[in-house]
Amino acid sequence: MDISLLLQLAVLLGAIFLGVRLGGLAIGYTGGLGVAVLALALGMEPGKVPYDVILIIMAVISAIAALQLAGGLDYLVRAAERLLRRNPKNINFLAPTVTYFLTILAGTGHTAFSMMPVIVEVAKSENIRPSAPLSIAVVASQIAITASPVSAAVVFMSGVLEPLGVSYPKLLLVWLVTTYAACMLVALLINLFGNLDLSKSKAYQRRLAEGLVKPHNVGERGELPEGARTSVWIFFGGVVAVVLYACAISPAVGLIKEPVLPRDGAIISFMMIIASLIVMCCKLDTGKLLDMSTFKSGMAACVCVLGVAWLGDTFVSGHIDAVKETASALVGNYPWLLAVALFFASMLLYSQAATAKAIMPAVILALGITPENNSQVYILVASFAAVSALFVLPTYPTLLGAVQMDDTGSTRIGRFVFNHSFLIPGVLAIVFAVALGFVVAPLVL
């Protein structure tokens, strides 16, 4: 390993850790800083800016913001809340189910924020430590990105894998089955072996004595806007249209032989159509869209993806020959190592889509996968869930939100940073999803 590689690696890791330390948008800013240092000081060719991923995120978030302003998100949250409150004893299973499918529908895990107060309240009412359902609910909202038809990560992966002979419907089937089953397996383990008794928590008893724990309260809800339900149906119809169109242009289905609109363009345009219909049908004040929390968090995600994905692509592209040689030797003999690489890469790159974009094309080249020689393509499909390790560093917004909203103190970040409430459930969920993927993918594909 020569000195230039060590310097480049130091810049890569230094930029990422500086961004993580500064927090928020800074991970995107320092990603751009890292690209500048690699290019201007160390002579590396700048990588490709992930325009496709960013545009998809922008389009989806624009539609989600319209849905939120119309009251559609509140409508979905109240429906999910009724489900949780009617079945409080099953909170450890229902909480991740709700956040998982909200993410599947919306294409962003930030929808989990709206469910956190409800999860905490229901858990407290059943004397269950909120950390149990909260931890797997947050993890489920992250891993569901790898199965959502409107997420940038899935759109990118399907665009890469379909030319290799894997049909879009089969990809969705594998990812939906394996990721949801993995979340439920972790929920089962938490239910069976977790320390669930809230009354025995020393942190809870201390906070209770100090008056820091809010009493169980269902609370009053205001009236939903008139167009709330309409906006949900419009959005749901748009998501179904995206899936149907993506299936129709899939070579395996072949309903549309020569599509004028590619999958990326379809999801962007369909999301804009959804937003337009919601604005018109629900008579929204478009000036308020910029104030929506989903819009702000989504645009922040675009900045973060811009920086870290560009930085990651710059580094990987500059060492593509070494990456190909190493990946060919290791992944060819030990397929599960791809999942390990994706796990650690996503931990640093902070985005499922950015990780897939940085790693997967190089692995395809390394393994020599082509439409004629695609026997190893199942490795990529099975390992995809491993790009969801955003929970390892306790700085992700939904993770921090869960810690802040749990007034019992059971959901926490430990003294040693990594010993937090989400690490074990998250690692188990990815291990189960990848393991199931290696079983299911060869059977389905």
Predicted feature residues:
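Membrane-interfacial helical/loop segments at transmembrane boundaries in membrane proteins
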Residues: S158-P163, V253-E258, K324-L330
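Terminal transmembrane helical module of multi-pass membrane proteins
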Residues: Q352, Y396-Q404
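Helix-loop-helix module between adjacent transmembrane segments
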Residues: I61-A65, A95-T111, I136-S148, W175-V186, ...
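Hydrophobic transmembrane alpha-helices of multi-pass small-molecule transporters
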Residues: M1-I64, A203-V316, I424-L445
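Membrane-core helix-loop-helix motifs of multi-pass transport proteins
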Residues: V120-S231, Q376-A385, G401-L445
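Membrane-embedded alpha-helical segments and adjacent helix-loop junctions characteristic
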Residues: L18-V20, T30-L33, M44-I128, A132-P133, ...
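Alpha-helical transmembrane segments
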Residues: D52-I61, L173-A187, P259-M271, I379-L393
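Active-site/pore-lining binding-face segments in mid-to-C-terminal subdomains
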Residues: M360, I364-N373, V377-L390
